[in-house]
């Protein structure tokens, strides 16, 4: 299929205040409620020694899929086709690559500034969870981080929140979207803080850990800004989904290199053995 780099495909608007509110509610349910409902339903049929991490990812993937299905049923065939056309628009793909580049190097720059001012930030609880899961279930992490999360998060924050708000006040739309997007990446951090805050033995450590996690907030805000800018540039949700997917793919690749390849290059007795190990890890992802 030929890509038309000059094609400009904008999302078809959803008319009416109530309809836009309903789209937002569906999005919030899809992000926070549906995966938990699926997890409870699955848990009723699993043995006590089930793999918690594996089934947690399955529940999240199924919950996200349920959200997308419900949203698409609500917005209708014409809008779905319009969104799908955006994924084969050369203009959108080109824009996504450019903005993913800006997101990656912008995050690096902000991270360097934060490190110089406050010391090197540790990865937050959300990132720690991804890192540990990648060791045991790399395929599921890739599926969630590179495909499902970009689709769901962009539909919620750029399509359901930024798009209608920008018609009223674009600056406010940027602020709310950025804060909301960055905030969801601290749900794990806040959960840990709240669980340990009442215990005098752990409260001090919990607060220190949470404050350390907050050092990563500027990085998420930069990512949120670039993703919102990507959507705003073309007015098509496919652009920000692709940008998000490309950016997350680069992060997963770096995680793979840091966890596996660099360790193998250090521990292996030859370059051939290093690449043999690399191919073995690639098999785990397929």
List each model region and its residues.
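Membrane-interface segments at the starts/ends of alpha-helical transmembrane spans
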Residues: 46-59, 131-135, 203-215
